[in-house]
From Swiss-Prot:
The keyword Lyase applies. Coiled coil: none annotated. Pathway: Pyrimidine metabolism; UMP biosynthesis via de novo pathway; UMP from orotate: step 2/2. Keywords: Decarboxylase, Lyase, Pyrimidine biosynthesis. The keyword Endoplasmic reticulum does not apply. CDD domains: OMP_decarboxylase_like. It comes from Hydrogenovibrio crunogenus (strain DSM 25203 / XCL-2). GO terms for biological process: 'de novo' pyrimidine nucleobase biosynthetic process; 'de novo' UMP biosynthetic process. This is Orotidine 5'-phosphate decarboxylase. The lineage of its organism: Bacteria, Pseudomonadati, Pseudomonadota, Gammaproteobacteria, Thiotrichales. It catalyses: orotidine 5'-phosphate + H(+) = UMP + CO2. Its EC number is 4.1.1.23. It comes from the Bacteria. Catalyzes the decarboxylation of orotidine 5'-monophosphate (OMP) to uridine 5'-monophosphate (UMP).
Length: 236
């Protein structure tokens, strides 16, 4: 008897909408076998756990992108709550340090449902001069590598980082570390406010595991066509 192969969509659509109804309406036009969904700070503030649970009920795997950054106990409790919500992925700021990340991982492992726990390294909108203003020396790439190594040694499943760093992260950390890449734009799309961007095919070739795509899909005249085009470009 043949067992069906579970889909593993590589595209994570960022539901960056100002109203929950808009996000829900948009999600209804998508296929859980073609993409996962990301719920960020604005949408979660508007819709809360109820929205996330509704999306999960519709068959979507959800990346809860709240970037927790606080004392270890507070972050641990937040990560456990997110895990019990049933999300596929949740993230914390690597700059919170080893103790915070280890507490977060322990909390996730103790939950009845265990999502991937991902560390945020350096925001894709930041460049060397931006880092210098907050007291971090070196380039974004150097800081991403340092924080990714810290996240890995703290037990996290992967990091959020731009595609430009993916090949170096693969060399330094290995193939089993999950790399979640925002700043993804199809070749004909506007770059908007993200500096370190790359096309979907180039990002996957560089070593990215999952691609976060927002406005090029959500603001497209034909979102499904764009999603299908991206999937085709990465061989999905």
């Amino acid at each position: 008897m043949n067992q069906s192969v579970q889909p593993d969509p590589k595209v994570v659509v960022a539901l960056d909408f100002p109203k929950t109804q808009l996000a829900e309406d948009f999600a209804r036009h998508l296929d859980p076998q073609l993409c996962r969904l990301k719920v960020g700070k604005e949408l979660f503030a508007l819709g809360g756990p109820q929205l996330v649970e509704k999306l999960i009920t519709q068959g979507f795997e959800v990346f809860l992108d709240l970037k927790y950054h606080d004392i270890p106990n507070t972050v641990a409790m937040a990560c456990r709550a997110a895990a019990e919500m049933g999300v596929w992925m949740v993230n914390v700021h690597s700059l919170g340090g080893r103790k915070m990340m280890e507490a977060a991982k322990e909390a996730v492992l103790s939950a009845s449902h265990q999502p991937l726990l991902i560390g945020v390294t350096i925001l894709t909108s930041m460049e060397t001069e931006d880092l210098a203003e907050i007291g971090l020396t070196g380039t974004p790439k150097e800081n991403v590598l340092r924080l990714a190594k810290l996240a890995h040694s703290s037990g996290l499943d992967g990091v959020v980082s731009s595609a430009q760093e993916a090949s170096d992260l693969r060399k330094e950390i290995g193939q089993d570390f999950c790399l979640v890449t925002p700043g993804i734009r199809p070749a004909n799309a506007d770059v908007n406010d993200q500096k370190r961007i790359m096309t979907p095919a180039d990002a996957m070739a560089a070593g990215s595991s999952y691609l976060v795509v927002g406005r090029p899909i959500t603001q497209a005249k034909d979102p499904i066509a764009v999603l299908n085009e991206i999937n085709a470009s990465i061989g999905r």
